[in-house]
Amino acid sequence: MSQVSTEFIPTRIAILTVSNRRGEEDDTSGHYLRDSAQEAGHHVVDKAIVKENRYAIRAQVSAWIASDDVQVVLITGGTGLTEGDQAPEALLPLFDREVEGFGEVFRMLSFEEIGTSTLQSRAVAGVANKTLIFAMPGSTKACRTAWENIIAPQLDARTRPCNFHPHLKK
């Protein structure tokens, strides 16, 4: 088990929206993640939108992994079953370790909301160069489910018995 802090420690977060249709003005899921992270006390240090292309996704995420400024990457979109949904294929080669439990718990929670449609979600998470990366579906409702029930509690250094803080770059 990890050591747990008695005070809130903000993390440095980058947000990536994967979409061929969304622009900054109508990026509702990206805006939700940004606003929620900031309201929780975290620092959103960058935000970007890339097309549904595994190499564009990988390039942007790789830059953040290499940066000392980013500890956590939140990705919305690109996790479904269509040909354009390539986030898992872009990310899995980058992971030093996959966090299998994220996808499992996300689909369990989603099942309560959308039933068997959750089978089409390929939400993934992993750690690369001490950067924690979460990829979730593009709907704002799915982002809310992931943020409120999984990500936010695990980014809080006060969460017991363990949280992700000991695994992040300083």
UniProtKB/Swiss-Prot annotation:
Q: Which GO terms describe its molecular function?
A: GTP binding; identical protein binding
Q: Could you tell me which cysteines form disulfide bridges?
A: none
Tell me the SUPFAM superfamilies matching this sequence.
Answer: Molybdenum cofactor biosynthesis proteins
- Recite the UniProt keywords alphabetically: GTP-binding, Molybdenum cofactor biosynthesis, Nucleotide-binding
Q: Which CDD domains match?
A: MogA_MoaB
Q: Which residues form a coiled coil?
A: none
Identify the pathway: Cofactor biosynthesis; molybdopterin biosynthesis
For this entry, list what GO says about its biological process.
Answer: Mo-molybdopterin cofactor biosynthetic process; protein hexamerization
Residue positions binding GTP: S110
Q: Which Pfam families does the record cross-reference, listed alphabetically? A: MoCF_biosynth
Q: Relate the induction remark in this record.
A: By anaerobiosis, repressed by the molybdenum cofactor.
| Gene Ontology CC terms, in alphabetical order | cytosol
| Function, in words | May be involved in the biosynthesis of molybdopterin. Can bind GTP and has low GTPase activity. Can bind MPT, but has no MPT adenylyl transferase activity.
PANTHER family in the cross-refs: MOLYBDENUM COFACTOR BIOSYNTHESIS PROTEIN B (PTHR43232:SF2)
Describe the protein's quaternary organization and the partners it interacts with. Answer: Homohexamer. Dimer of trimers.
Similarity comment text for this entry: Belongs to the MoaB/Mog family.
The protein, known as: Molybdenum cofactor biosynthesis protein B
